[in-house]
């Protein structure tokens, strides 16, 4: 026994050497463990120091700013209110507009919704936001590209009208003499947006040529015609490069469902031979009705475009609170829709009508109201017709 450590007397020299090596290695490990303990203690002290620093005003401000952006993306009005209450944003149209224009971490759909509201503050922010855009010496398409990239244009007609009116005023202020009035700029802007859709939407088969585009815009310059070279340049620019529409999420459909017109659980009657009711999560947005198996699904099980469809209440002996989507004056054709099968294949729908049951009478009425609003006439065409009529009336009033 040596230093209180037991050592068997009958060990061979080789075994004694092995035992000595083990003891030495044990001592080295004990030293290493102690060193690691000291390093861990230092690291814990550093972590505690970092946690203490997180209590600093700068980090607290950054955290609250991130929280405010998140709130804005979910509810723009509440997000702005949160930032103002925490003194992260001044409650002035100019400061709010600058915050939206910079757009750091902001959802462009939410920006568009906020700018389109009719409240006095929102209207002032809209004009301050538009004033941050520099359109001097840009042709109309170039200016529209810049403007429409800074937010996502909302779907409501009145919101679009206010935003495009503000754009037309700003463009004419930056480029005096190009158009005789803001009405002309407004009408031509819509004509360009619709041209972009017609030329680049694969569902539009009848692509307008230059001559038709020129003919569409005759007489809009206070009764006179715009220079054909101007219209040709605008047409060529759109034909060669479509507008880039902001998408707040890159690779899936999530952005489509960010701010729906309506969403909720409904029962849908199947279109197969055996008619069964299935519970689905429905989302109404962008003039389409999407349905999912679960609220957490990123991809819908089915898509029902609402174009050319109507809606009506129906009685069903099996389910209460029913309504139907149908084609008016239908002569046996199926509704244009698609669904995803269990094996992932996308197939055409098999419905002449879609019968749906809501949980309550109140929810049924709300769904019918929302869907009726979604299947209304294209707001672009309504507003364009109204503005052209205004130009025509103004011209007649000016005639002796």
UniProtKB/Swiss-Prot annotation:
Residues reported to bind a 1,2-diacyl-sn-glycero-3-phospho-(1D-myo-inositol-3,4,5-trisphosphate): 268-276, 280, 291, 301, 339, 350-351
| Assembly | Heteromer. Composed of TAMALIN, CYTH2 and at least one GRM1. Interacts with ARRB1. Interacts with ARL4D; the interaction is direct. Directly interacts with CCDC120 through the coiled coil domain; this interaction stabilizes CCDC120, possibly by preventing its ubiquitination, and is required for neurite growth in a neuroblastoma cell line. Interacts with FRMD4A. Interacts (via N-terminal domain) with INAVA (via N-terminal domain).
Q: Does the keyword Zinc apply?
A: no
Q: Which domain of life is it from?
A: Eukaryota
The UniProt record lists the PH domain at 259-376
Provide the coiled-coil residue spans: 10-67
Which Gene Ontology terms describe the biological processes this protein takes part in?
regulation of ARF protein signal transduction; regulation of cell adhesion
Q: Which GO cellular component does the record give, naming just one?
A: bicellular tight junction
Q: Where is this region: C-terminal autoinhibitory region?
A: 387-395
Function as written in the Swiss-Prot or TrEMBL entry: Acts as a guanine-nucleotide exchange factor (GEF). Promotes guanine-nucleotide exchange on ARF1, ARF3 and ARF6. Activates ARF factors through replacement of GDP with GTP. The cell membrane form, in association with ARL4 proteins, recruits ARF6 to the plasma membrane. Involved in neurite growth.
**Membrane topology note:** Peripheral membrane protein
Protein name stated in the entry: Cytohesin-2
Q: Which organism is it from?
A: Mus musculus (Mouse)
Please give the record's comment on domains.
Binds via its PH domain to the inositol head group of phosphatidylinositol 3,4,5-trisphosphate. The PH domain is necessary and sufficient for plasma membrane relocalization.
Looking at the record, the residues that make up the SEC7 domain are 72-201
Asked if the keyword Coiled coil belongs to this entry, the reply reads yes
Check the record and name the PANTHER family matching this protein: CYTOHESIN-2, GUANYL-NUCLEOTIDE EXCHANGE FACTOR
Q: What is the effect of changing residue 339 to A?
A: Abolishes phosphatidylinositol 3,4,5-trisphosphate binding
The protein's location, in the record's own words, is: Cell membrane; Cytoplasm; Cell projection; Cell projection, Growth cone
UniProt tissue specificity: Present in all tissues tested, with highest protein levels in brain and adrenal.
Stated consequence of mutating residue 278 to A: Strongly reduces phosphatidylinositol 3,4,5-trisphosphate binding
Query: Could you tell me the keywords of this UniProt record?
Result: Cell junction, Cell membrane, Cell projection, Coiled coil, Cytoplasm, Guanine-nucleotide releasing factor, Lipid-binding, Membrane, Tight junction
Tell me, what's a Pfam family for it? Answer: Sec7
Q: Which GO terms describe its molecular function?
A: guanyl-nucleotide exchange factor activity; inositol 1,4,5 trisphosphate binding; lipid binding
Q: What is the effect of changing residue 268 to A?
A: Abolishes phosphatidylinositol 3,4,5-trisphosphate binding
């Amino acid at each position: 026994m040596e230093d209180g450590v037991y050592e068997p007397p009958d060990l061979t020299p080789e075994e004694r050497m092995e035992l000595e090596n083990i003891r030495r290695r044990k001592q080295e490990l004990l030293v290493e463990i102690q060193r690691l303990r000291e390093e861990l203690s230092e690291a814990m002290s550093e972590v505690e120091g970092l946690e203490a620093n997180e209590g600093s005003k700068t980090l607290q401000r950054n955290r609250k700013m991130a929280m405010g952006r998140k709130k804005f993306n979910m509810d723009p009005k509440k997000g702005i209110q949160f930032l103002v209450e925490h003194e992260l944003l001044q409650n002035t149209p100019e400061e709010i507009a600058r915050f939206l224009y910079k757009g750091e971490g902001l959802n462009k759909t939410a920006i568009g919704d906020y700018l389109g509201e009719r409240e006095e503050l929102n209207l002032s922010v809209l004009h301050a936001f538009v004033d941050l855009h520099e359109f001097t010496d840009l042709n109309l398409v170039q200016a529209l590209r810049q403007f429409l990239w800074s937010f996502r244009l909302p779907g409501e007609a009145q919101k679009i009208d206010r935003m495009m009116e503000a754009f037309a005023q700003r463009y004419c202020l930056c480029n005096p003499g190009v158009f005789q009035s803001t009405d002309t700029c407004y009408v031509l802007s819509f004509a360009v947006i619709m041209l972009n859709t017609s030329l680049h939407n694969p569902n539009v088969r009848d692509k307008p040529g230059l001559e038709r585009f020129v003919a569409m815009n005759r007489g809009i310059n206070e009764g006179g015609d715009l220079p054909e070279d101007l219209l040709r340049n605008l047409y060529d620019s759109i034909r060669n490069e479509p507008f880039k529409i902001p998408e707040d999420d890159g690779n899936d459909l999530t952005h489509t469902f960010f701010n729906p017109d309506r969403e909720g659980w409904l029962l849908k009657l199947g279109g197969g031979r055996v008619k069964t009711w299935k519970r689905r999560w429905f989302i109404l947005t962008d003039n389409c009705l999407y349905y999912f198996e679960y609220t957490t699904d990123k991809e819908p099980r089915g898509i029902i475009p609402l174009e050319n469809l109507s809606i009506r209440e129906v009685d069903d002996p099996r389910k209460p609170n029913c309504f139907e989507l149908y084609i008016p004056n239908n002569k046996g054709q199926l509704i244009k829709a698609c669904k995803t099968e269990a094996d992932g294949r996308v197939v055409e729908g098999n419905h002449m009508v879609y019968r749906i049951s809501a949980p309550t009478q109140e929810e049924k009425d709300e769904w019918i109201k929302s869907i009726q609003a979604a299947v209304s006439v294209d707001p672009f065409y309504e507003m364009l017709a109204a503005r052209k009529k205004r130009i025509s009336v103004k011209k007649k009033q000016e005639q002796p």
